[in-house]
Amino acid sequence: MGMTASNAIATFFKYFVLILVGLIMIYPLLWMISATFKDNSEIFAGIGLWIKNPTLEGYRNALNNFGGSINILQAMLNTYSYVLPKVICTVVSSCIAAYGFGRFDFPGRKILFSIMLATLFLPQVVLNVPQFLLYTKFGWVNSPFYLAIWVHCAFATETYFVYQLVQFMRNVPRDLDEAAAIDGCSSFQTLYKVIVPMLMPDLVSCALFQFMWSCNDFMGPLLYVQTPAKYPMSLFVKLSMDGDTGFAWNRILALSLISILPQLIVFFCAQDQFVEGISAGAVKG
């Protein structure tokens, strides 16, 4: 049966709104890409995408060393040398903690879970001073392995992901646990042989969130990394902004674009599982 006029109009407006919102969301990224090929005068002349006098000076300057101590490649290697361990530790520890809260009944479970959730209301700035003092005593500040930035994630300190995975586990039938126990599986065998494969889209979504948040983190490296040669991309971009003599915005935008490319690639490669994981978490809360 053909589409009626009212349905056609409704469909047109629906897609029109979606396309309009999509353009509004993506326009800043498109402008940033075009601005990397402009000089300062053209960048501040307007917000259009058209490039009158294209130049690669921004990318050439972005690849130069700053003070001879670090370049963009080293900064990216520094970034992922703590981002990857942080993501792995977060996913593993949060999954184990969520498994304990979501599948077992033990004395004080609800109280402990409530206390854990209460930590979500603590601003990170409140924790910065005690954490800095503690990590200083441990000798982790300015550690070559960035221990102060990621080691705590091995102890399920990322409450948001624990809570998120608990919600996901509520969608997994408990009959599977009983069937695994009948087959002789221990609790940990049930976790990684039965639960984890079913939670893979949810784990991917948690990993993506942590990956993007860690790559964009500025305060953590600012507190715990004190040697310019160890700076990650977030501090490297700030290092390239000389407030005394002024700076070329095409270089800053080129650095920013290069820094987010790995995040975009990872997101687009895992977007199907990411959407599936987010949708699964919304089924039951």
Model-assigned labels for residue ranges:
Residues 3-285:
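A structural signal for multi-pass alpha-helical bundles of membrane permease subunits
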